[in-house]
């Protein structure tokens, strides 16, 4: 069972590794997204759930980051962990997001990526390698965070 992160100062932890496993999930509209489809871009993969208060709290900053860096070079993929589509749709009607929300029914991807606490995020560089991980809530629109992610963008 997953736990929600307690209130502590989460930070970007630098790593240099391949993603834990392939990502291939459908979004709430039924469109399939594969991590490989985004090769050449920076991808922020965020695992979350509507019942997770820190997850809900960080969503606006993820949306601001998507809007700030949201060129063809950057995308947020929010992986919802095993919740009914109706619950996710209700959440999205109250908090529209400018990035895809993917459905991990049965938590198969969540387990494959070894996510045990929500929210959990992975920043994947254009070459397909994980460059940062975060466990817990983070203000993704904080200038220092934006700067670190922007440095990964192609042409930077």
Regions found by a protein language model. Give the residues of each.
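Structural microenvironment flanking redox-active thiols in thiol-disulfide oxidoreductases
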Residues: 56-95, 105-112
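N-terminal signal peptide c-region/cleavage motif recognized by signal peptidases
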Residues: 4-6
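Short loop/turn microsegments at loop-to-beta-strand junctions
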Residues: 20-21, 43, 118-120
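N-terminal "domain-start" segment that seeds a small globular fold
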Residues: 8-35
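Hydrophobic beta-strand core positions in alpha/beta domains
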Residues: 44-46, 76-78, 122-123
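Short active-site neighborhood of thiol/selenol oxidoreductases, capturing the structured segment around
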Residues: 36-53
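Structural signature of beta-strand start/N-cap positions in the alpha/beta core
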Residues: 41-43, 73-75, 100
């Amino acid at each position: 069972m997953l736990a929600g992160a307690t209130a502590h100062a989460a930070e970007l932890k630098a790593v240099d590794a391949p993603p834990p496993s392939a990502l291939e999930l459908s979004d709430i509209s039924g469109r399939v997204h594969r991590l490989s489809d985004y090769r050449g871009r920076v991808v922020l993969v965020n695992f979350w759930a509507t019942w997770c208060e820190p997850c809900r709290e960080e969503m606006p900053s993820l949306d601001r980051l998507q809007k700030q860096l949201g060129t063809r070079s950057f995308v947020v993929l929010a992986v919802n962990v095993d919740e009914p589509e109706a619950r996710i749709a209700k959440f999205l009607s109250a908090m529209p997001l400018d990035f895809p929300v993917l459905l991990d029914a049965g938590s198969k991807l969540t387990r494959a990526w070894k996510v045990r606490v929500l929210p959990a995020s992975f920043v994947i560089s254009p070459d397909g390698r994980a460059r940062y991980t975060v466990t817990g809530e983070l203000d993704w629109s904080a200038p220092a965070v934006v700067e670190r992610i922007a440095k990964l963008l192609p042409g930077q």
